[in-house]
Amino acid sequence: RLELPAFIATLGTMMVSRGLGSIVSKTKTISFPQGTAEGAWFREIFMVTKEGGLFPKNFPTGFLLLAICAAVMAVVLNKTKTGRYILSIGSNKEATRLSGINVKKYETLAYVFSGFFAALAGIAYVAVFSTAQPNTGNGFELDAIAGVVIGGTSLSGGVGSILGTIIGVFIMTVLKIGFPYIGVQSHYQLFITGIILVFAVYMDILNRK
């Protein structure tokens, strides 16, 4: 309703949320030893930690949840009017409004979808690592942006796919996991991530010309 640019609104609410997290936790690490212990129900949602079940031990059930969510959102984005309207708003908001579509409604839905999956990712992180810190996730937004752009989503809006996003995020994850194994230190990792992001955005600009 404030008509803020989506990127600025996202960064602003991210900073507010981080600040609230620091205030509530008093900047201390919070542990969840009971809910996330081996075999506990909370952790079992995202990873099998005991023998004798449907899946083998250490099977990442969170991957199945990811696949289900991705499939559902792919259908929503490509096969429903909600998805088509969201893409249309990203492509040309004013033309979409003049077509009689409730732009604010579908913009809000896009934010709701984004917030829901960000929250789900946070829950998964806590379930797997058993702790939560106010600064957990700092820098993840750069990886997310880079992954999305690498996956073919245009920063100008209107172009993108769920499968492309998953592929882009997978590439970024492989790089982050692989860097330590080849001796790349953390500050170099951030530098390389920045280079990848700039290159991906540049390629997006070239594709739109």
Where does each model-flagged region fall?
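Membrane-helix interface residues
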Residues: 2-4, 80, 101, 160, ...
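Loop-to-transmembrane alpha-helix initiation sites
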Residues: 6-7, 58-66, 107, 139-141, ...
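Transmembrane helix-bundle core of multi-pass membrane transporters
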Residues: 6-80, 106-109, 129-134
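Hydrophobic core segments of alpha-helical transmembrane domains in multi-pass membrane transport
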Residues: 14-21, 63-76, 111-122, 150-153, ...
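Membrane-helix/interface signature in polytopic inner-membrane proteins
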Residues: 71-111
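Cytosolic-side transmembrane-helix boundaries in multi-pass membrane proteins
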Residues: 91, 98-105, 175-209
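Transmembrane alpha-helical segments in multi-pass inner-membrane proteins
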Residues: 111-112, 117-118, 128-193
